[in-house]
Amino acid sequence: MDKSESTSAGRNRRRRPRRGSRSASSSADANFRVLSQQLSRLNKTLAAGRPTINHPTFVGSERCRPGYTFTSITLKPPKIDRGSYYGKRLLLPDSVTEYDKKLVSRIQIRVNPLPKFDSTVWVTVRKVLASSDLSVAAISAMFADGASPVLVYQYAASGVQANNKLLYDLSAMRADIGDMRKYAILVYSKDDALETDELVLHVDIEHQRIPTSGVLPV
């Protein structure tokens, strides 16, 4: 081998990447793939819990159960004195109650504070007798008997408490739209007086689909 061939061979050897560099590159690629997979799984998990245009308040569900839709009611409790109570029956629009035999599968309450809210409230849904006047004494007894789950909502510096929803499954009870007048939303203002501009309750009633008019209103 002459000198030029020896020099060329030396150059070729020098051009080869070092084994350590190749290993570091492969390791970085593998780490990137693992991170990408983790981010993909995280995005899927978060997407499953996001509201959607089809079902904006049943968080965690992209759509109603097959054959079902939902009707929303918004309640703003009036001023409630400290240690006192408020109750409101579930009154659906006439266009819905017309189909009173359609089954109801779920009721969800979502508690949203308004800017002035800095209190603690207890919220629940209860089936009440038609004769009940939802007096303070009657509501107090229903909160005390432990027969229904209660959402304790407190002031959160971030604006909205993470667990601000209650979901009731009525499918096993075969409840229907006509039964909804027998249910009431109950609120207990535990520590402070609740002002009229402090709290909003969004109530979603998931029920079997009802016929809709094919003619636009004029």
UniProtKB/Swiss-Prot annotation:
Keyword Ribonucleoprotein: yes
Comment field on protein domains: The N-terminal arginine-rich stretch does not seem to be the major RNA-binding region that allows formation of an infectious ribonucleoprotein complex.
Similarity comment: Belongs to the cucumovirus capsid protein family.
Keywords: Acetylation, Capsid protein, Ribonucleoprotein, RNA-binding, T=3 icosahedral capsid protein, Viral nucleoprotein, Virion
Record's protein name: Capsid protein
Described function: Capsid protein. Probably binds RNA and plays a role in packaging.
Domain of life: Viruses
Basic residues bias: start-end ranges: 11-21
UniProt source species: Cucumber mosaic virus (strain P6) (CMV)
GO molecular function, one term: RNA binding
Spans annotated as Disordered: 1-30
Residue(s) carrying N-acetylmethionine: M1
Compartments reported by the entry: Virion
Biased composition (Low complexity): 1-10
SUPFAM superfamilies: Positive stranded ssRNA viruses (SSF88633)
Gene Ontology cellular component terms for the protein in this record: ribonucleoprotein complex; T=3 icosahedral viral capsid; viral nucleocapsid
